[in-house]
Amino acid sequence: MRMNSMCAIMSLTDSSSKDLYPLTRLRPVAALPVAGRYRAIDFQLSSISHAGIDSVGIFIGGSGRSIYDHIRSGSAWGLESKLRGGIFTFSQTYLKQVMGDESFDENNFYVNHKEFLKKSLAKYVVVSGGKIVAKVDLQDVLDFHLANDGDVTLIYKNVPVEKVRNHPYEKVAVLEQDNKLQRLISSLDWNYPDEMVAHSLNMYLLPVKTLLDIIERADKEGIR
């Protein structure tokens, strides 16, 4: 294992996709075009590639066809399958939520998450959604995480309140004076005392072991 190596998980299950019907009826928000030639997912994959991450798990709520057709082998980002690593896609996670997982271990909602993380052999994992278009230096985020010795590092951006006010699917990071996260709340529940607000980019960095522990707790409590 390379010291401080990273893998990445992208969760393309954003509930706001329903507000973009019919565009997102058969595809996640991450597959929608941006500036004509790009897709929203391209920006996340570029940040992942530039950080030297070579193992990416993409979990898709519904059909993954639009994602498969676009990313193909991942060669555009240097993520084509090697001896170890590559892009691994897991679709129809919504169906697993509906069907339940009591009968067979292979139908367990989190089995693919756990298998991907363990086989990546990475020490840290970047977890993100797919709808935020942003350029993020994930190596800098890892350096920050290591320097501050936190459990989880949340990536956010200070933006004018108009960017998030009245957007029910956006999250505001409520920070303490030392910039440690106090809680995440819906943009509708924030009282906006200042002109700027810490807008969550729905990206996190944490140790793989910590995420596996979180998954185990969620599984025991029936959280999907």
Describe the predicted segments one by one.
Residues 2-85:
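N-terminal glycine-rich phosphate-binding loop and ensuing alpha1 helix
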Residues 12, 130, 208:
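Residues immediately flanking
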Residues 41, 145, 207:
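Residue-level signal for inorganic ion chemistry
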Residues 52-54, 121, 149, 180:
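Short loop/turn motifs at secondary-structure junctions
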Residues 62, 128, 206-207:
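A conserved hydrophobic position in a structured secondary element of the catalytic/binding core
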Residues 74-76, 170-177:
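Short, hinge-like loop/turn segments at secondary-structure boundaries
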Residues 84-171, 218:
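Conserved beta-loop-beta/alpha segment of the NTase-like Rossmann-fold superfamily
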Residues 175-224:
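Catalytic-core segments of class I nucleotidyltransferases/pyrophosphorylases
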